Amino acid sequence: MNDIILTSQKLYKSYHDGTSTVEVLKGVDLAITKGDRIAIIGPSGSGKSTLLHLLGGLDKPTSGLITLGNVNWQKINEKQRCQLRNQQLGFVYQFHHLLPEFTALENVMMPLLLAGMAVKDAEEKAINMLEHVGLKPRLAHKPAQLSGGERQRVAIARALVHQPHCVLADEPTGNLDEATASKVFDLMLELNKKMNTALVIVTHDQRIAERMDRVLVLHEGSLYARE
């Protein structure tokens, strides 16, 4: 059985500023399998977030191939990309990106409702997921009524509620104090193990990187395993 869920092959990404071309990624190859724990590290501005956006179908490469399951990102239209993202990927960012006018429960229900799930079923799954992250008593609270760590836990619940094959996380603990960051990261690893969801984290935090199964370095456009 093939457990590879997300791949990039010979991935290039360039930006033009009007007078010159900046090559950010130069032939990046990556294979992500079920349950993987991967940290991507590298200097600021090296293209780590760009790589994550490309893997998630949020941006298009200059050239190369990105495959999610058996689907080539470049061969489908934007509507199909949105549907595939919502079915198979979860995203967690440094800023939680919760919708401020909605409660924690409503924020976590959102991806399920967008996928066409009935409200009652979506509510049941969202409550269960918020219970998993220790927030069942905070279901009716809006983001402004939650602490930074609680908001990030809601964001994690939202990313995992539809049981994605892979979660792409960009500095998910970057805005949190050390103690809260450690608790949030522990939670991500626990859910990764329990749900067998691949976890790919872009981070500057060496303590986080050390706890992942694979540490990849992005430097001068190339991605390689840290020795």
Curated annotation (Swiss-Prot):
Gene3D superfamilies for this protein? P-loop containing nucleotide triphosphate hydrolases
SUPFAM superfamilies xrefs = P-loop containing nucleoside triphosphate hydrolases
Q: Which SMART domains match?
A: AAA (SM00382)
Taking every annotated instance into account, which residue ranges of this chain make up the domain ABC transporter? Answer: 6-227
Q: EC top class, in one word?
A: translocase
Might you name a Gene Ontology BP term for this protein?
lipoprotein localization to outer membrane
What InterPro entries is this protein classified in?
AAA+_ATPase (IPR003593), ABC_transporter-like_ATP-bd (IPR003439), ABC_transporter-like_CS (IPR017871), ABC_transpr_LolD-like (IPR015854), LolD_lipo_ATP-bd (IPR011924), MacB-like_ATP-bd (IPR017911), P-loop_NTPase (IPR027417)
Localization annotation? Cell inner membrane
Quote any Pfam family the record assigns.
Answer: ABC_tran
Q: Name one GO molecular function term.
A: ATP hydrolysis activity
Q: How does it sit in the membrane?
A: Peripheral membrane protein
Q: What is its EC number?
A: 7.6.2.-
Keyword annotations for this protein, in alphabetical order, are: ATP-binding, Cell inner membrane, Cell membrane, Membrane, Nucleotide-binding, Translocase, Transport
Residues engaged in binding ATP: 42-49
GO CC term, one of those recorded? plasma membrane
* Oligomeric form and interacting partners: The complex is composed of two ATP-binding proteins (LolD) and two transmembrane proteins (LolC and LolE).
Q: Belongs to which family?
A: Belongs to the ABC transporter superfamily. Lipoprotein translocase (TC 3.A.1.125) family.
The entry's function note states: Part of the ABC transporter complex LolCDE involved in the translocation of mature outer membrane-directed lipoproteins, from the inner membrane to the periplasmic chaperone, LolA. Responsible for the formation of the LolA-lipoprotein complex in an ATP-dependent manner.
The name under which this protein is listed is: Lipoprotein-releasing system ATP-binding protein LolD
Q: Which organism does this record belong to?
A: Legionella pneumophila subsp. pneumophila (strain Philadelphia 1 / ATCC 33152 / DSM 7513)
| Taxonomic classification | Bacteria, Pseudomonadati, Pseudomonadota, Gammaproteobacteria, Legionellales
